[in-house]
Amino acid sequence: MSESNELIEQRIQKIEELKKQGINPYPVRFFPDSKSKDIAEKFEKNPTGPETKFKLGGRLHSKRVMGKASFAHLKDNSGIIQLYATKDDLGETQYSIFKSLDLGDIIGLEGYLFKTQKGEITLHVTSVELLAKCIRPLPVVKEKDGVVYDAFADVEQRYRMRYVDLIVNDHVRDTFITRSKIVSEIRSFLTQEGFLEVETPMMQPIAGGAAARPFVTHHNTLDMQLFLRIAPELYLKRLIVGGMDRVFELNRNFRNEGISTKHNPEFTMMEAYMAFGDMSTMLDLTERLITHLAQKICGTLKIQYGKDLIDLSPPWKRTTYVDIIKEYSGIDFSQIISLEEAKKKASELKVDVSKCQTIWKVADEVFSEKAEPNLIQPIFITDYPKELSPLAKSNPDKPGYVERFEPYVAGREIGNAFTELNDPFDQKERFEDQVKQREAGDDEAFMMDEDYIRALEYGMPPTGGLGIGIDRLVMLLTNSHSIRDTILFPLMRPE
């Protein structure tokens, strides 16, 4: 039997021993009235005596048994506090239970605070109760100096067993607490800007709103094929048609694509649409939102991301899609007239464009390989080609291009926005072109959506639209370098 299995068996045996004593190892309830950090801070300012009792609940973090007295540490979601327990105070039965506790056990305590000779605020335990046994041993390095867990450093294992990761790595928990604050702050910001939060279908008969492969499912009762949404865009714009002038949705999207440090098949997006807005109003909104978040969450507009100090102070730099590709690859795609020439130039840069069917698809691969990794400081890339933007309004001053921008920070895209196409005739033509690309083998090309065309035929006002990837934004504001570090339960291969 392995050492781990032996420890598990020993802990299970302790549960059985408690049952024999008539003690329920999984009691129905325990209600703490305090948090360790709060009572320690208050005690430091205003010491209390034995008459003031506190009830705490948490995990046993460390333990040192010294005969009739023991020291330990309890960890709750506010911090760690030292415990002092004696046989005289607890009595034979409870002190025996205290001594038999294992690291990771969830316990309930009652006691009063005092300071040790070394000046450490400590809970003098007067009552102890096992609330849930930690049957599987937590990763342990040592049981002294307040350091009892290893780093749980195997990344794959951390993602698979996030519950253990959260127990042993405080910085992981801090990341997800920050994520929650970011999401809450986004909602508050947009609400103050006059946007109404809405919910649109997660299952859609047509996968639209983005160039991506969808997940496919089937509704048995209706006997119809459905897709998990790749984007909420077309439904949100239907709401603009219906007179809801400012709407946003912050929710999940699903794309049946690869997994990387920047991509997870299930991810969170915020999309916002503003009637009587355009690309410029959404650019302003994006800049204000992200700088607001940085100031609120990080306390500064200059944030450290890896080795780079990123300055989010407005105004952000702006440059065109064609110019940024030319800057980092030397290729001016506005001057290329054949697919063969485009592929040849890309291949000279060792960019794989074998699956690309158009010049601008080649350009996009070159952009991703050569330009994007260099966009460390915040920048808005503008004036995208019409072919790559089937839902964006054409730029009247630049034929072949649209009113679209994407913000980039730390070498990755964090959003996408444009002046929305509201001409139903133009939109139908673009859908038809996308269908041709799809029939030619591009499984990321858009599907035809006749109902969306019908909605546009009722009239949609000039509109600005914006989408921001929440997971990537959290990466930026928490100095995380994999999207999996910002998603509690990322998709994993089977063990």
Swiss-Prot record:
One of its GO terms (cellular component) is cytoplasm. Keywords: Aminoacyl-tRNA synthetase, ATP-binding, Cytoplasm, Ligase, Magnesium, Metal-binding, Nucleotide-binding, Protein biosynthesis. It is found in: Cytoplasm. It comes from the Bacteria. Pfam families: tRNA-synt_2, tRNA_anti-codon. It catalyses: tRNA(Lys) + L-lysine + ATP = L-lysyl-tRNA(Lys) + AMP + diphosphate. GO terms for molecular function: ATP binding; lysine-tRNA ligase activity; magnesium ion binding; tRNA binding. Binds 3 Mg(2+) ions per subunit. GO terms for biological process: lysyl-tRNA aminoacylation. This is Lysine--tRNA ligase. It comes from Leptospira interrogans serogroup Icterohaemorrhagiae serovar Lai (strain 56601). The gene is lysS.
